[in-house]
Structures are given as structure tokens and as C-alpha cells.
A protein has these predicted regions:
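Elongated, mostly alpha-helical coiled-coil "stalk/stator" tethers of large membrane protein machines
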Residues: 1-178
């Protein structure tokens, strides 16, 4: 995420917080990012210098007609400044600020097989106790980890996978003097 994305996304969050619209604008911002990412040609059109900015902004007005005026104005501002490519970073910055204000920690759990419901509940309870935060868990299945669990959260990786243990063992064996 660039500094520009942090600044713009953070500013939108501050405005939303002042107006008590953080949840609504977060959902609409996600929808906007997903829509624009799903249609890369649309982003190219909105970024084309040969199309006057006024017309590009009119396209945004039409595409996001039902969205909150703050979001539409935000998108138009990015368009006018030729910064629509920063929109995913703006969403990340907004989400980060939202998470801090709402004591939320996003965690990605990677395992060889899907977690069972009881294991998921135990993991959530342990993470909540360990961090004191509300956990939003994203699960990913990757057979390459062979077994165990890898957790990525807030820039920290806790790796208890069989794959990692084998890598560590391989490194120790390679470093051993024979």
C-alpha cells in the first residue's frame, strides 16, 4: 500500500467516522473495488487521458448511482487526480483503520485440510484470548503444508506446519559437519 493510498483511504475513513458511516462506506468501498477489479477495461477507460475527466466522472456517477455520495465523490476525486489505480490500497487503508477502531484482528489460517468446526472454534477462542481482539478468520487449504497450521496476522507468521519443520530439519542437516 502506497503512502497516497494510506492518506486517501485514511481521510475517507475519518470522514465516515465523523458521520457514523464507517460500516456502510466500508461495504460500498469493497463493492467498488470488486467491481472495478472485475472489469479491468473499465479502469483503463477511467484512466485514459484522451477521455476528458468530466466524462470519466460522469461514468462514475452513472456506475455508482445508488452509492453514498461520499463514496461517489471519493471515486471522482481519485479519477480527477489519476489515482484510481490506488483504490485497492485505499480500501486496505480504510479497512486497517476500521479494524483498529473496532479492535479487530484479521488472521489467515493455512492448513493441509479444512479445519473442522470444533477446531475452528478452539482456534478462534485461543487467538481471542491471546490477542484480546475480535478475530476475523480466513481459512486457506494448501496440501503443500502437509499438516499442522500456519497463521498470518498483523505482519507476524506463526508456522507450525510439517512443511516448515521439514525445512528446518533440512537446514540443520545441511549445516551439520560430517
Amino acid at each position: 500500500m502506497t503512502e497516497l493510498a494510506k492518506r486517501y483511504g485514511g481521510s475517507l475513513y475519518e470522514l465516515a467516522a465523523e458521520e457514523n458511516l464507517t460500516v456502510e462506506l466500508l461495504q460500498q468501498l469493497r463493492t467498488a473495488v470488486n467491481s472495478i477489479e472485475a472489469e479491468p477495461q473499465y479502469l483503463r477507460l477511467l484512466s485514459t487521458p484522451s477521455v476528458p475527466k468530466k466524462e470519466r466522472c460522469a461514468l462514475l456517477d452513472k456506475a455508482f448511482e445508488g452509492a453514498h455520495p461520499y463514496l461517489v465523490s471519493f471515486l471522482k476525486l481519485l479519477c480527477e487526480e489519476d489515482l484510481l489505480g490506488e483504490l485497492p490500497g485505499c480500501l486496505r487503508a480504510y479497512q486497517d483503520r476500521y479494524n483498529v477502531d473496532h479492535n479487530i484482528l484479521e488472521v489467515t489460517a493455512v492448513s493441509a485440510i479444512a479445519l473442522t468446526a470444533p477446531n475452528r472454534e478452539k482456534l478462534l477462542a485461543k487467538l481471542q484470548k491471546m490477542t484480546g481482539k475480535n478475530i476475523v478468520l480466513t481459512e486457506t487449504v494448501d496440501p503443500a503444508v502437509l499438516g499442522g497450521l500456519r497463521l498470518d496476522m498483523d505482519g507476524t507468521r506463526l508456522d507450525g506446519t510439517v512443511q516448515r519443520h521439514l525445512e528446518r530439519l533440512r537446514t540443520e542437516i545441511d549445516g551439520a559437519v560430517l
